[in-house]
């Protein structure tokens, strides 16, 4: 029995060892499966991260690069092209600066947050600075569009007062005011700062939270978007109404006699006859060989007729400019409306799904960034001067084209609006007495029949050439 007990005990011990061995093998097998499963998860995560980086690269080429390149071209065009250096176009250049800064400092960092799955990858102190620049440059872009619409409406409604204030200095003052308003709207972000968790400082999301910036998200959206949007819509329709009213008056006005275009008594003296080829005294004092045809009456009336079309051409150019503005505002509305509506909803709606709204904000903010790259495209499509300048700059040709303006120089000094004293000073400076060069003086009896006619042609050519130049300028500045 003892022997039997020992064998039974031995058998029991052997079975116990065998059971433990089997359990160990099973655990080892399960551990191997877990390790294999963990490896698969790590591989899947790596693939997902690779897809995120690839998508980020597509965003760089699709949004950021065109935004930077297009706005640089706009800044170069206004800076180098004399035909584009007008007060209104300085607004466009400042708008391009704001959009360029969005492409340089805001979009790349926003792209980094996408690559790192919304975790702030830079030093913590840079987070409020980046948020401030984001709000500042985006607000400045919106405010510039609002200022341009206001400026256009005032120029059409009160052209005389607007022309008196339409200087480079005045434009720079207006631009400064726009930037100061934008800074005032964005300044609460760095003052308030972000609420950082010191324990998890490496896992911070750089965004405006509802708890800390709820009131700013609401009132900032009203000041930076909805108020300018209201102003733009109202001024745009008022501008269209004013242009239609002007066009109606131009089409239905009675034909005007040209009695106000009588030649000044300063020039109603004898002048040399141009019916034969000889040197003609130009208004800038130079000499030029020129033959005037005998049918000077027909030429004069044709030039007067073309000058009479100036108001209609101006109305047409202004209507075209308003259409371009309408396209700009339409794109602006489509690009920024989703973001600001979602932003206000996030600030007001407590029962809404906050995670879903934050995800929509991350998508819609990039739609808003696209607006910074759309503006240069619109200028390229609708403005021939911008289009020609962009084409030359892309081929590294930065030399501005020279506009042909033969009598433009003297027209800025001598024209009907000047006083008689100013015109007399001009003649004295260029050695012309009573509108005549002494070296070219001939007998009054010989030239009596063509005196007033020839002098009228000289000054009317100057006046009409100036009008033609204004016509070109109107076509250059569409905004």
UniProtKB/Swiss-Prot annotation:
The keyword Lipoprotein applies. Ergotamine binds at residues 134, 139, 208. Glycans are attached at residues 203, 353. Disulfide bonds join 127-206, 349-352. Keywords: Behavior, Cell membrane, Disulfide bond, G-protein coupled receptor, Glycoprotein, Lipoprotein, Membrane, Palmitate, Receptor, Synapse, Synaptosome, Transducer, Transmembrane, Transmembrane helix. Residues 1-55, 113-128, 192-215, 345-359 are extracellular. A motif (DRY motif) lies at residues 151-153. Stomach fundus. It comes from the Eukaryota. One of its GO terms (molecular function) is GTPase activator activity. GO terms for cellular component: cytoplasm; dendrite; G protein-coupled serotonin receptor complex; neuronal cell body; plasma membrane; synapse. It is found in: Cell membrane; Synapse, Synaptosome. Gene3D superfamilies: Rhodopsin 7-helix transmembrane proteins. It is a multi-pass membrane protein. The record marks 208 as: Hydrophobic barrier that decreases the speed of ligand binding and dissociation. A motif (PDZ-binding) lies at residues 477-479. Residues 79-89, 151-170, 239-323, 382-479 are cytoplasmic. The chain crosses the membrane at residues 56-78, 90-112, 129-150, 171-191, 216-238, 324-344, 360-381. A lipid is attached at residue 396 (S-palmitoyl cysteine). Interacts (via C-terminus) with MPDZ. Ligands are bound in a hydrophobic pocket formed by the transmembrane helices. Belongs to the G-protein coupled receptor 1 family. G-protein coupled receptor for 5-hydroxytryptamine (serotonin). Also functions as a receptor for various ergot alkaloid derivatives and psychoactive substances. Ligand binding causes a conformation change that triggers signaling via guanine nucleotide-binding proteins (G proteins) and modulates the activity of downstream effectors. This is 5-hydroxytryptamine receptor 2B. The gene is Htr2b.
């Amino acid at each position: 029995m003892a022997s039997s007990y020992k064998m039974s005990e031995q058998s029991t011990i052997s079975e116990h060892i065998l059971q433990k061995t089997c359990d160990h093998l099973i655990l080892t097998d399960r551990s191997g499966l877990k390790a294999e499963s963990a490896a698969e998860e790590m591989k899947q995560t790596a693939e997902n991260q690779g897809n995120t980086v690839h998508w980020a690269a597509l965003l760089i080429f699709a949004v950021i690069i065109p935004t930077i390149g297009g706005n640089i071209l706009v800044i170069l065009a206004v800076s180098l092209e004399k035909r584009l250096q007008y007060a209104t176009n300085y607004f466009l250049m400042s708008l391009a600066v704001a959009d360029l800064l969005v492409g340089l400092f805001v979009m790349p960092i926003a792209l980094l947050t996408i690559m790192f799955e919304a975790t702030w990858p830079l030093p913590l102190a840079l987070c409020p600075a980046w948020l401030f620049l984001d709000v500042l440059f985006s607000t400045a872009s919106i405010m510039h569009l609002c200022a341009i619409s206001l400026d256009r409406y005032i120029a059409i409604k009160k052209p005389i007062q607007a022309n008196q204030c339409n200087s480079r200095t005045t434009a720079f003052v207006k631009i400064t005011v726009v930037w100061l308003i934008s800074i005032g709207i964005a300044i609460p972000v760095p003052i308030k700062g972000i609420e950082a968790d010191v324990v998890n400082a490496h896992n911070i999301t750089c965004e405006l939270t509802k708890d800390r910036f709820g009131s700013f998200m609401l009132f900032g959206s009203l000041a930076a978007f909805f108020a300018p949007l209201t102003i733009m819509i109202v001024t745009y329709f008022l501008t269209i109404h004013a242009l239609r009213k002007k066009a109606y008056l131009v089409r239905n006005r009675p034909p005007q006699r040209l009695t106000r275009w009588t030649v000044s008594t300063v020039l109603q003296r004898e002048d040399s006859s141009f019916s034969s080829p000889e040197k003609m005294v130009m208004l800038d004092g130079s000499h030029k060989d020129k033959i005037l045809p005998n049918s000077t009456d027909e030429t004069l009336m044709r030039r007067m007729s073309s000058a009479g079309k100036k108001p209609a051409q101006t109305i047409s150019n202004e209507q075209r400019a308003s259409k371009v503005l309408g396209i700009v505002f339409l794109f602006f509305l489509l690009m920024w409306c989703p973001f600001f509506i979602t932003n206000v909803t996030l600030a007001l709606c407590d029962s809404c799904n906050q995670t879903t709204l934050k995800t929509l904000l991350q998508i819609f903010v990039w739609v808003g960034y696209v607006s910074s790259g759309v503006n240069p495209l619109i200028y390229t499509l609708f403005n021939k001067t911008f289009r020609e300048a962009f084409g030359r700059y892309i081929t590294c040709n930065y030399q501005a084209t020279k506009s042909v303006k033969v009598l433009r120089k003297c027209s800025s000094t001598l024209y009907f609006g000047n006083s008689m004293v100013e015109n007399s000073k001009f003649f004295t400076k260029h050695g012309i007495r009573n509108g005549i060069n002494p070296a070219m003086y001939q007998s009054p009896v010989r030239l009596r029949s063509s005196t007033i006619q020839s002098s009228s042609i000289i000054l009317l050519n100057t006046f009409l050439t100036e009008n033609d130049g204004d016509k070109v300028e109107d076509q250059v500045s569409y905004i």
